[in-house]
Amino acid sequence: MTASSWELLALYLGALLLAAWPLGIWLARISSGRLPGWMQRVEAPLLRLAGTSADQAMNWWQYALALLAFNALGLLAVYALQRLQAVLPLNPAGMAAISPDSAFNTAISFVSNTNWQGYGGEASMSYLTQMLALAVQNFLSAATGIAVVFALFRGFAARATGAIGNFWVDVTRITAWLLLPLSLVFALFLAGNGVIQNFDAYKDVATLEATSYQQPKTGLDGQPLKDAQGAAVMENVRTDKQTLAMGPVASQEAIKMLGTNGGGFFNANSAHPYENPNALTNFFQMLAIFLIPAALCFAFGREVGDLRQGWAVLAAMTVMFVIAVVAITPAEQAGNPLLTPLGVDQAASALQAGGNMEGKETRFGINASSLFAVITTAASCGAVIAMHDSFTPLGGMVPMVMMQLGEVVFGGTGTGLYGMLIFAILAVFISGLMIGRTPEYLGKKIESHEMKLTSIAILVTPILVLAGTAVAVLAGAGRAGVANPGAHGFSEILYALSSAGNNNGSAFAGLSANTPFYNTLLGLAMWLGRFGVIVPVLAIAGSLAAKKRLPVTPGTMPTHGPLFVLLLIGTVLLVGLLNYVPALALGPVVEHLMLWPAH
């Protein structure tokens, strides 16, 4: 890594720490209900409208049923808006209705906080669909994840009550007093720095010269046509005009990052200058992705009565994050050995970023693109400023591994921390076995019931990813979507399932995934990957809440020091990553060995 790479990383972590600490204090107050009186008076009518109140607690299965019903209704609403958008207002570009399979996939994608996009936003979605369906779910899916980790906080902090809070109260407070205020401020900042915010019709402008190109031919339903072999039917196009898409971008961009959603208003996502114009907006977008996940660590420490617990979890996350950045940046700075015999200068200098610049924006370069790639995949965000499919084999493997760890390195809003706490429970259990003592974490005994639920929560996503990859590789419809042969084609499929199953949403975009096969397969992976983990986590929270809190004794294993941090990191790497080693060996590892030794 160059000196500038280290400087950017240090600046980022310093700014993150400064911003996350005060937000963590506020998150703890929201979780515990210690809000100013005027806020409670504002939210009271909303809660009455929902038929509940702030003092009406739920047990874990009531909380889970409310959460599942809420998200199921969101799924139906997003699906309906897509299917009806052709006859609804705020559609100046005349977008057609989305096909049933694509609408199904997109609805699950945004409800599950994955934001996988098999479509191009500016070519498919009306302004109404973007705002009322997708942007709304950006708020609600993020609030759902934070609500679940709040419930887990209460499970650790409760003293034999069995109650873990009220889902409706949590979602209302998180949305009203956290996500909306932060998004408003961030949207104003983005709009002031060049991110567009309007309802104008698309604008046609003349280009400097005529351009000829090929594009997939589409049918009446707006979907690409396929030939008998399943390949896209191409058509030749010549034009001297360019269409500039417009829209209310800044308002959606803010919650896209703060909620670790990641779904772009435009197909190029945050590489598009209308979403991310310059280095300043890019830095703050990176900061926004990790802001709430980092702040939740501090809130966790406050809620369980020991700030050191939050620092320990944050330290484990940060160490793994830094290792990933240190791995990906040199891989991208090394460049492509196939270009060296052609006399291409790939050395970094004052005049060029050097390295592997394929698929990257010159306004960001290698350092920011590599850092962003790790942030967005560590945090289950999935927004991109560079095409991960164009990274070097090892450079592309790092984002894949970040997802396959279970999105626990900071992770999504709420999801990252509850995922890491599940690994903490496992780490405590393993340490208890080694010393012959009943394991306990934060004063709660970890027994067979909790370990069964922990095993389910950890194994759900690897099963979905590996089984889904096997199905896609074996099925003709799955192989038809692969643009590249050999190891990289396998990596494209593995990346897609890793992204969907772990609710990230980024892609190796060479995979043609907007087909009935992939829309269905990835949709199921996203839904089960989201709620197949949430339900066991809530069950663990309920089980812990019903237990008494034990006093600390000389035999209690400390869970706030460097030893526990190392144990936690080791547990995440050994349990979370070993599942995928054979698959990674068939994809990026083989591709790397084919690329470098021969050159």
Swiss-Prot record:
Name this polypeptide is given: Potassium-transporting ATPase potassium-binding subunit
Origin: domain of life: Bacteria
Keywords: Cell inner membrane, Cell membrane, Ion transport, Membrane, Potassium, Potassium transport, Transmembrane, Transmembrane helix, Transport
Family designation: Belongs to the KdpA family.
InterPro entries on file: KdpA
GO MF assignments: P-type potassium transmembrane transporter activity; potassium ion binding
Compartments where found: Cell inner membrane
Topology class, membrane: Multi-pass membrane protein
Classification via Pfam families: KdpA (PF03814)
